[in-house]
Structures are given as structure tokens and as C-alpha cells.
Amino acid sequence: GNVYKRQDIDHGTYPYVTSSNPSAGGITVGNGFVPTKGLKVLGISKAYTSRVGDGPFPTELFDETGKTIRDLGHEYGAVTGRERRCGWIDLVQLRYSIMINGVTKLIMMKSDVLDSFDTIKACVAYELPDGTQTNNFPYDIEHVKPIYRELSGWKTDMTQFTSEEQFPHAFKD
């Protein structure tokens, strides 16, 4: 997913990072595992974005939609019960995370949280402070503005499916 990249000591949104490498590369650092050719790296991402604690969050929603995502997704700290910050999926950060980690297959979880939405938004690029647009992950995301693509919701109970072939077209798109 894209959360661990934002918190990675080397690739995260410093100073809002952890002291470790919670990425595919961090596996080798922590246990001495030597990757070989043909290694499959599974990336896991939510269908929306959430964040614990401080730090830049371009797609954060401060309205009722953000609260709805938080409630439906049970986005509360397990120990403290603290509300997590929620927003639309940030494809700029997700693409960056996929690239840095060498992800070979992406698994999308919690898509059922968005089942009831007529439309959803996906951040496909950023507007930088100077007005230019980029779909590359910039060094500093503190003041970027998300550029969204609005998509039709799938309006289907995603928990009923057992294979990718069953997914509705609106979800696959």
C-alpha cells in the first residue's frame, strides 16, 4: 500500500516518518533475506487513503464523506480508538510506492467501504504551488493540491465476490 512509503525513513514524508524501513526492501535489511530473480512482490492498498498522526495528506477529506469512509472502514486506532484521517485514493503516491517496492501484483482491500457511493474520486496528479501539474511524486507534498478524476461507483456489495471475474465493470475501470 501507499501508507508505508509515506512513513519510510528513506522515502517517506520526512519528518513524519517511522525509524525503520516498512517496505519491500526493508525485508532484506531486517532478516538477511537475499532476493533472487523472479521474486514476486505483492503490494496491498486500500481503495481509499488513511493516515495516522501528523503529516501531509493531499487527499484528506474534512467533510461528511471523510467521516463516512472512516466509519464504514472502521478507521480508528486499535489501542487508543483515535480517529484516523481518511481521504480519496492517491494514485500518485500509490504509483510511487509500487515503483520503489518493485510491486509485481497489487491487491486492493476495503473496496467494500465505498460500495454505497454514487461516485468516487481518485487523485491522478498534483498541482504544485507554482501552478504546474505533475503526476510524479514530488519531494515536498506539503502544499500540493490533488487533481481528481471522478469515477462511477460500483453500487454493489463487493463482499459477495470470490474471484476477480465477478467484479463489476465500474470497479475494474
Predicted regions and their residues:
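Short, small-residue-biased leader/transition segments that mark boundaries at the very start
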Residues: 3-4
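Short beta-strand-to-turn element immediately C-terminal to the catalytic PLP-Schiff-base lysine
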Residues: 7-8, 30
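A short alpha/beta connector and helix-capping loop motif
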Residues: 9-23, 101-102
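Hydrophobic alpha-helical scaffolding
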Residues: 13-17, 31, 82-87, 164-168
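Short Gly/charged-rich anion-binding patches and loops
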Residues: 22-23, 92-93, 173
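A glycine- and small/hydrophobic-rich beta-loop-beta segment
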Residues: 27-150, 158
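Extended hydrophobic packing segments that form well-structured cores
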Residues: 148-173
